[in-house]
Amino acid sequence: MHKRTLIQNATIVNEGEAFLGSLLIVNHHIEEVLRGQNAESVCPPDEVINAQGCYLLPGVIDTHVHFRDPGLTHKADMKSESRAAAAGGVTTVLDMPNVVPQTTTDEALALKEAIAAERCVVNYGFLVGATNENAEFLRRINRRRVAAIKVFMGSSTGNMLVDHEEVLARLFANRRLPIVTHCEDTTLINFAMKKCQAVNGPDPAVRFHAQIRSAEACYRSTELAVRLAHEYDTRLHVAHLSTARELELFDLAAYPKVTAEVCLPHLLFTDADYDRLGARIKCNPSVKTREDRDALRAALADGRISTVATDHAPHLLREKQGGAARAVSGMPMVQFSLVGMLGLVDEGVLTLPRLIETMCHEPARIFDIENRGFLRPGYKADFVLVRPHSPWTLTPNRIESKCNWSPLEGRTFRWRVEKTFCNGYLLYNQGHITDEDHKGQAVTYAR
């Protein structure tokens, strides 16, 4: 049985254009992208949704989330965080490997796949983690099974540090899968922490976090990753740039295989916000200066940075108590990433077509994701309807994440997510998940 649904009279934003039109979907796929007011297909639809006044965007692909499942489900799980994603217009997520057990073996990956198949309401894919000992697993893994290999070149939540130079060289030389790096120099960080503790006590105030996890620590590690990628011709995507200086290392014209991501915390906050928000904005790498934030925004707008992600990393608030040493790093962000970035469009930081490039098109290209990320006939019907000029203020009762807090609480947004369609199914509708038991699909990769 084929169900034909026509989304009519929306402003469609896709592949560098914005135009008034309609979208015809048949079951799980896009059938036609139609231009003009009241555009209709030759074949009559079974249902018409009037989207007048809304923008119709491809579903967001968030390539950097930590849904904490398995093993850390007291703070988040696949069901709760995928609900948050759907409520935010995110239809596909790539989940990171620092869970319990770490996703560094075939058995651990199979467990995670089974959990997601049962509990994830949006589409999902995974990165597997590199360690100093699992080279054989990474050599034989099916390239169409996972998005990339995550390499922690700096220690962070989960303690998956890869610090043997010969292991790093082998990883970059392998070239079977893209590599995504967390780049911070652990030696510099440990030295800075001890120096800060000597003056400020065992748990320095959170405002020292940016000095401890410093710009120099980021630059030194990112420089090594980029140098290895150039040497071995590796497909490298550097996660969560946080400094202006790191931007000097990227030249897409000369090295198109080496790309960069920026995450919401480093676009929305600066070190001036530590006094107000404290450990709620403590993350790794640290939130740094206004100059760094503004440089990252400019690089995102002009194309030097390829993708926006969230680094969605929920913790319970009690785990966020303390200072730079004791409070855990990470914050929930997936539910409000799209409306947060649309706010930057309103501020003139970047255009709406450029935003869609960074949150939808480029994530699909960089990770070889099949049939998602674009509004094209034959592609999966993953899309979101958002309404501008519809202000609302973020309060805890709106939060879907299990941890039930956000560093953005109290902020007023001018855009509202009205409907999220995932594989042609209306999953989120004006404030409500429509089906608690909906199951997303595993991402496939064109390799």
Task: Place the predicted regions along the sequence by residue.
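N-terminal metal-binding scaffold of metallo-dependent hydrolase/deaminase domains
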Residues: 1-42
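Histidine-centered catalytic micro-motifs
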Residues: 59-70, 180-184, 241, 310
